């Protein structure tokens, strides 16, 4: 009888705890699931050989709402195309689309958002924005070359930057088959962004 009463008592607590997962955290879990599935798919993964065979899932920082910020967005008018150097020594053409300014722990930061001229040729990427950045976790818990975020053109003057959905470039896992844009100097943050994908440097040995 006592065991039955205990179950009745705990059940609503379990139900309540399941309901407390926020919409934002669900979005991050979806991102993590899709990223793992991509790397497990032999047709999509950048991994090769034993790295692919041994891959199970990415390590992630714990979800932290602190790293989901609403930034003020200012579009860059009449920006000219320019070349961003890549990890292979080649270059890729981009143009600056705008600036995103936000606060983290009470301090202001600004990051530049870009558009890939190659991707602009494809209809499905017309509203795609590219945000490469570096932070103080690089070469420790994250890839030394920095991380990326995929965003969409905002409709107003604000944009959500969810660093929980930041990921490492393909070059972090396969430096031979990919050439990845190097993070511009203006997008190097002097603070730790403990969010998104972590990195185990087992891929370049």
Q: Residue spans of the language-model regions?
A:
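Bacterial Sec-dependent N-terminal signal peptides
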Residues: 1-23
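Mid-length scaffold segments of soluble, non-membrane domains
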Residues: 80-144
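Short, surface-exposed linear segments at secondary-structure transitions and domain or protein termini
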Residues: 118-126, 151-159, 201
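Acidic, glycine-rich flexible loop segments
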Residues: 132-168
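Start-of-domain marker
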Residues: 19-80
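A mature extracytoplasmic/lumenal domain signature
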Residues: 73, 113-117, 135-137, 163-167, ...
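Terminal leader/tail segments of proteins
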Residues: 67, 79-86, 98, 186, ...
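Extended, aromatic/histidine-rich regions of cofactor-dependent oxidoreductases associated
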Residues: 21-25, 167-205
């Amino acid at each position: 009888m006592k065991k039955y009463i205990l179950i009745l008592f705990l059940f609503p607590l379990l139900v309540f705890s399941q309901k407390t997962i926020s919409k934002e955290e669900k979005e991050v879990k979806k991102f993590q699931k899709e990223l793992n599935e991509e790397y497990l798919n032999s047709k999509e993964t950048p991994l090769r050989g034993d790295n692919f065979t041994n891959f199970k899932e990415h390590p992630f920082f714990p979800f932290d709402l602190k790293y989901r910020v609403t930034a003020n967005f200012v579009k860059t008018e009449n920006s000219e195309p320019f070349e961003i150097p890549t990890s292979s020594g080649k270059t890729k053409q981009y143009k600056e689309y705008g600036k995103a300014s936000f606060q983290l722990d009470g301090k202001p930061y600004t990051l530049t958002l870009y558009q890939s001229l190659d991707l602009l040729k494809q209809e499905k990427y017309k509203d795609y924005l590219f945000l490469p950045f570096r932070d103080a976790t690089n070469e420790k818990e994250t890839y030394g070359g920095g991380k990326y975020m995929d965003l969409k053109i905002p409709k107003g003057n604000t944009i959500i930057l969810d660093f929980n959905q930041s990921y490492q470039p393909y070059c972090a896992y396969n430096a031979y088959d990919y050439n990845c844009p190097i993070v511009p100097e203006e997008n190097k943050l002097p603070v730790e962004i403990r969010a998104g994908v972590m990195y185990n440097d087992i891929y370049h040995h």
